[in-house]
Amino acid sequence: MGRWALDVAFVWKAALTLGLVLLYYCFSIGITFYNKWLTKSFHFPLFMTMLHLAVIFLFSALSRALVQCSSHKARVVLSWTDYLRRVAPTALATALDVGLSNWSFLYITVSLYTMTKSSAVLFILIFSLIFKLEELRAALVLVVLLIAGGLFMFTYKSTQFNVEGFALVLGASFIGGIRWTLTQILLQKADLGLQNPIDTMFHLQPLMFLGLFPLFAIFEGLHLSTSEKIFRFQDTGLLLWVLGSLLLGGILAFGLGFSEFLLVSRTSSLTLSIAGIFKEVCTLLLAAHLLGDQISLLNWLGFALCLSGISLHVALKALHSRGDGGPKPLKSLGSSADLELLLRSSQQEEEDGEEEYFVTQGQQ
C-alpha cells in the first residue's frame, strides 16, 4: 500500500511538472511567434511593447487587489524616493531590452533572434563579474567562450542574416545583461519588499512605459499618428482587430511571467533553466518548419555549441547550490533572458499565506 502511494505521488508530481513546463512553453514560444507574426503587418513594435506593458500592469494590479482582499494584508508600495532611485535603473534597462528585442522582429528571423537572445547569458555573466555577484573561475571563462563561439558559428555566412536586426537584438542582449544584474541586486534588497514577482511587475511597468516612450515618440510617433490602423482608421473592424491582437500579446506576456512563477514555485529554478534550454531547441525547430527559416549544418553546430555553454552554466549553478546546502533564491541566473523576474526557489518555504493563495488561484 505504501509503495503504491509513493508511485501515485511520483506520477502526480511528474505530471504536474510536465503540465507546468508545457504551459510555460505555450506562453514563451507563443509570444515569440506572436511578435514575429504581428510585426509583419503592424510595423510599430515599440507601440506594441508599450501596450503590452500597460496590460501587464493592469493584470498585476488586479492580482495584487485579489490577494489583498483575500489575505487582508496590505501589499508593498514603495516611496517615491526608493521608486525613482532604486527601481528606475532596472526598469529603464528592462524597457530597452524588451523594446529592442521586439523591434528586431521587423528585420530578422525567429531562429536568428532565438540564437542571439540565448547569448544574453554571456552578458549576464560579464556584468555579474563586474558587480562582483560572481567569482571569476576557469569554468566561467569556458562558458563564455562556448556561447560566444556558438553565436559566431550560427551567424557566419547565414543566408538570412540582417545586420540591422542582429545589431538590435545583440544590443538588447547586452542591455539584458545589465537588466538581470540590476534585477538580482534589486530583489536581494529585502527592505524593499519586492521578493514577490507580482509586486515587482507592478512597480516596474509604469517606469518601463515612461522609459520606452521617448524612443516611441522619435521613431514611431508621427507614423503611428497618420496610420489608418489606429488613429486615422476608416474601418472599425480593422481597428478592433488590431486592438484585439495587441491585447492578446499583453495577455501572453503576463501569462509567460505567471507560468514561470508557477513552474519555479512548484518545482525549482533549475527545472525552469533546463526547460529553457529545450525551449530554445523547440523554437528553432518550429521556426524552420513553420516559417521556413534556413538553418545550415554550421548554424546547427553553432547552436549546439551555444547550448552546451548554457548547459554547463546551469550545471555549475546546480553544483554550487548543492555545495552550499541547497538552492538559494535569486542566486541562479537562468538560461533564457525572459526568466529572471520570477525566479524563486521552491525549496524556500513561503511565509505569506497570500502567496500560496495566488499560486493556488493560478492552477484553477
From Swiss-Prot:
Q: Does the keyword Transport belong to this entry? A: yes
Q: Per UniProt, what is the membrane topology?
A: Multi-pass membrane protein
Origin organism of this chain?
Mus musculus
Residues annotated as transmembrane:
14-34, 42-62, 104-124, 136-156, 166-186, 202-222, 238-258, 272-292, 295-315
Tell me which GO cellular component terms the UniProt record holds: cis-Golgi network; endoplasmic reticulum-Golgi intermediate compartment; endoplasmic reticulum-Golgi intermediate compartment membrane; nucleoplasm
Keywords from the named record: Glycoprotein, Golgi apparatus, Membrane, Phosphoprotein, Transmembrane, Transmembrane helix, Transport
Q: What family does the entry list?
A: Belongs to the TPT transporter family. SLC35C subfamily.
Kindly give the CDD domains that the UniProt entry links to this protein.
TPT_S35C2
Q: Which residues carry this modification: Phosphoserine?
A: 335-336
Q: What is this protein called?
A: Solute carrier family 35 member C2
Q: What does this protein do?
A: May play an important role in the cellular response to tissue hypoxia. May be either a GDP-fucose transporter that competes with SLC35C1 for GDP-fucose, or a factor that otherwise enhances the fucosylation of Notch and is required for optimal Notch signaling in mammalian cells.
- One record GO biological process: positive regulation of Notch signaling pathway
Concerning Pfam families, the annotation shows: TPT
Q: Where in the cell is it found?
A: Golgi apparatus, cis-Golgi network membrane; Endoplasmic reticulum-Golgi intermediate compartment membrane
Predominant cellular place of this UniProt entry's protein: Golgi
Q: Which residues are glycosylated?
A: 102
Say yes or no: keyword Transferase present: no
